[in-house]
Curated annotation (Swiss-Prot):
Organism of origin: Salmonella typhimurium (strain LT2 / SGSC1412 / ATCC 700720)
Known pathway: Quinol/quinone metabolism; 1,4-dihydroxy-2-naphthoate biosynthesis; 1,4-dihydroxy-2-naphthoate from chorismate: step 6/7; Quinol/quinone metabolism; menaquinone biosynthesis
Keywords assigned by UniProt, alphabetized: Lyase, Menaquinone biosynthesis
Cofactors demanded by this protein: hydrogencarbonate
Function: Converts o-succinylbenzoyl-CoA (OSB-CoA) to 1,4-dihydroxy-2-naphthoyl-CoA (DHNA-CoA).
Gene Ontology CC: one annotated term: cytosol
Binding site for hydrogencarbonate: Q154, T155, G156
Residues annotated as site: Important for catalysis: Y97, Y258
Binding partners and assembly: Homohexamer.
Taxonomic path: Bacteria, Pseudomonadati, Pseudomonadota, Gammaproteobacteria, Enterobacterales
Protein name: 1,4-dihydroxy-2-naphthoyl-CoA synthase
HAMAP family, alphabetized: MenB
Family: Belongs to the enoyl-CoA hydratase/isomerase family. MenB subfamily.
GO biological process, one term: menaquinone biosynthetic process
EC number, as in UniProt: 4.1.3.36
Amino acid sequence: MIYPDETMLYAPVEWHDCSEGYTDIRYEKSTDGIAKITINRPQVRNAFRPLTVKEMIQALADARYDDNVGVIILTGEGDKAFCAGGDQKVRGDYGGYQDDSGVHHLNVLDFQRQIRTCPKPVVAMVAGYSIGGGHVLHMMCDLTIAAENAIFGQTGPKVGSFDGGWGASYMARIVGQKKAREIWFLCRQYDAQQALDMGLVNTVVPLADLEKETVRWCREMLQNSPMALRCLKAALNADCDGQAGLQELAGNATMLFYMTEEGQEGRNAFNQKRQPDFSKFKRNP
């Protein structure tokens, strides 16, 4: 996507509703390559239940495999909350949150991994409260655009919960060990400027400009090489994610190699039942 005039980055976005079949989220796509997933439970500050997470997983998978989508926005309905974390009213006694059939889930962990491994940038658009599991979700996104009314923090130790995975380790990478311990141990809340100062968000904008500025950031990324963005995301993740991160980065390297004449020579030779001839390819220093 090319925007010859910078003012076009702020042009009104045309959203197409793709929400059929969903009850807890709204799912939309723009005409210029942006998908938007909105947690639609404002009556509970967009807290998620197992169904909410299941629908977000489905929508993000659709956005990943849609060739017309280059970047994804994750947000919450209304201006009062991005997401307040897991809905404590459906938290059960057997290790998770109950669905309508009584089965317990922690499927938000699957959604965290999905955001992390999605080869397309995922941008959190945060207004109001981003608390608990919702705070972890915004951290998992590649970028966070916050409204001036955004509030950030963890509540786990106050409600008998914690996220010892990315919610702790990745937070420490972002804000440092001491600050991460403060955020988790004290369960304080932080305003948007404080979050910006500690590196939890990328920018803070007036609430009225939140979507406009988020779309601008998305459109800027859409002008860049999708393969470069994909590999950069994998490389940045690999710094934190151990062998799983290396596997993701290596998979992208394999994909690039498959696109080369050298890689295709090996495949063609196998299919043609002949010895491959790699002598024509340079051995660069």
